[in-house]
Amino acid sequence: MATSSSAWLIFSDHYPEILIAIACFLIFSLLLSARSSSEDSLPYNWPIFGMLPAIISNSQFNDFTTARLRKMGWTFIFKGPWLLDMDYIFTCDPSNINHMFNDNFENYPKGELGKVFDIFGNNIFNADGDLWHDHRKMAQTILWDGNYRTMQATFIRNKMDNALIPILDSAASKRKPVDLQDVFFRFTFDTSCFSVLAADPESLTMEFPAVPFSKAADQALDAALTRHITPRLIWKLKRFFNVGSERTLAVAWKVIDSYIYDKIAELKAKRKLVGKINSYDAVSFYMDNFNIHDDKFLRDNAFTYLLAQRNTQSLTMAWLFYALFENPKVELKILSELKSIVDESSERRFNDGFALFDSNMIQSAIYLHATLCEALRIYPPVPFEIKDAHKADVLPSGHKVRAGEKILFSPYAMARMKGIWGDDCLEFKPERWITGNGTLKHEPAYKFFAFSAGPRICLGKELSFTQMKMVVATIIYNFHLQMVKGHVVEQSNSILMDMKHGLMVQVRKRSVM
């Protein structure tokens, strides 16, 4: 035995390249096998590696997961590498989601997963228990305040008038393609900064300037995804040694903090100079209504508000237009509805020949609202979320959950299940959201999960719908957009469902008045 060991050591010392080649061959074979596994079967559960190679080797995580969930009856056990605490329960079963977010809500807190998103700090996103309840009450006061909503609507209208329409008009005149996803990212970044920090960064201009904050925020979310698929010990070691994705996160964190803290300081300096001002941005609201002036508290909540508004609205609108490119009859129905609204409205808002839709005009846009719902159903901005169990539990599907075990649930997959949304689940069909009486149809939040469900359901849901309808209506009524021929739309493998290559479009003015 000793002789055999000595021979192995001599071999490894003199021929390391052969050992490396063997290791590479084994890894390549393992990945190739994982990639070639049938969509009708679970990922192969390898010794040591578990099912992780199948995930790593697949470029479309959401579609990969959907296929397995469809085959396995909406729930299956994902086995991670040995000894690394990476086993998950994957599910898209509405009864399981209702159980976690409603019936047994207290057993599925943010808990350890809050540490994955530590860049958000100690706010409504990461908080649990009494602290979360306090955060939610304050957020509700802000988001439901009439002055706050009026300020938001006015700024959005002005931003459409002074930035969005001129940029699209210029693109039409010059016949120059524009990345619509980037336009929406910039638009919502400007509007969210104003609503949160009373500042307009003016990122949506003809020059399309670099936006360090937005880039840093995207990098931070990518790092969070890396943490999700990396053993906790590994990403904590990477953070300790400041390498890889953790180094990227640290740099991005500094950019984010610098921007938000600077804006908070500017707002405080202005208030000190002129006294209390009638500003209804979120940060001013915390200071005026709740007497909270702590910079760290204000920073944490500002960052959450900024990302919530910027990402969800921009991605929803981008995917909506992509769906319209694939379903032009839907666009014609929206246009017909908008023409009727303009004809009947006593508040026609035109500027240089362009119609602007305000929050009052779009209240009766039922078909447009249904189209947004359908876009959110098929293309949820957050395609999957993760929970972990505080105590052992049994899901309605019959699957046992260990204390501390993680559950990944997929709204993206849920939208693609015939047993949940019907045989036409893959069709983009706004009509599914309209009743026989012509009113909007309600679906339970655990089935239509775009705004979360249960006690944590999004407080800004209706406000978000109103803002998106204003923007989408204004674009569709004034312009006809077409996707650039040959442009490929592909999902990024990310926590958010953004378009990897953007959404390049040609713009043409529309004559509808």
From Swiss-Prot:
<protein>
    <recommendedName>
        <fullName>Noroxomaritidine synthase 3</fullName>
        <ecNumber>1.14.19.50</ecNumber>
    </recommendedName>
</protein>
<keyword id="KW-0560">Oxidoreductase</keyword>
<dbReference type="GO" id="GO:0009820">
    <property type="term" value="P:alkaloid metabolic process"/>
</dbReference>
<dbReference type="Pfam" id="PF00067">
    <property type="entry name" value="p450"/>
</dbReference>
<keyword id="KW-0503">Monooxygenase</keyword>
<dbReference type="GO" id="GO:0004497">
    <property type="term" value="F:monooxygenase activity"/>
</dbReference>
<keyword id="KW-0349">Heme</keyword>
<dbReference type="InterPro" id="IPR002401">
    <property type="entry name" value="Cyt_P450_E_grp-I"/>
</dbReference>
<dbReference type="GO" id="GO:0005506">
    <property type="term" value="F:iron ion binding"/>
</dbReference>
<dbReference type="GO" id="GO:0016705">
    <property type="term" value="F:oxidoreductase activity, acting on paired donors, with incorporation or reduction of molecular oxygen"/>
</dbReference>
<dbReference type="GO" id="GO:0016020">
    <property type="term" value="C:membrane"/>
</dbReference>
<comment type="pathway">
    <text>Alkaloid biosynthesis.</text>
</comment>
<dbReference type="GO" id="GO:0020037">
    <property type="term" value="F:heme binding"/>
</dbReference>
<comment type="similarity">
    <text>Belongs to the cytochrome P450 family.</text>
</comment>
<dbReference type="InterPro" id="IPR036396">
    <property type="entry name" value="Cyt_P450_sf"/>
</dbReference>
<keyword id="KW-0472">Membrane</keyword>
<keyword id="KW-1133">Transmembrane helix</keyword>
<dbReference type="GO" id="GO:0006629">
    <property type="term" value="P:lipid metabolic process"/>
</dbReference>
<comment type="function">
    <text>Cytochrome P450 that catalyzes an intramolecular para-para' C-C phenol coupling of 4'-O-methylnorbelladine in alkaloids biosynthesis, including haemanthamine- and crinamine-type alkaloids, promising anticancer agents. Catalyzes the formation of (10bR,4aS)-noroxomaritidine and (10bS,4aR)-noroxomaritidine from 4'-O-methylnorbelladine.</text>
</comment>
<keyword id="KW-0812">Transmembrane</keyword>
<feature type="binding site" description="axial binding residue">
    <location>
        <position position="458"/>
    </location>
    <ligand>
        <name>heme</name>
    </ligand>
</feature>
<dbReference type="InterPro" id="IPR017972">
    <property type="entry name" value="Cyt_P450_CS"/>
</dbReference>
<keyword id="KW-0479">Metal-binding</keyword>
<keyword id="KW-0017">Alkaloid metabolism</keyword>
<dbReference type="InterPro" id="IPR001128">
    <property type="entry name" value="Cyt_P450"/>
</dbReference>
<keyword id="KW-0408">Iron</keyword>
<feature type="transmembrane region" description="Helical">
    <location>
        <begin position="14"/>
        <end position="34"/>
    </location>
</feature>
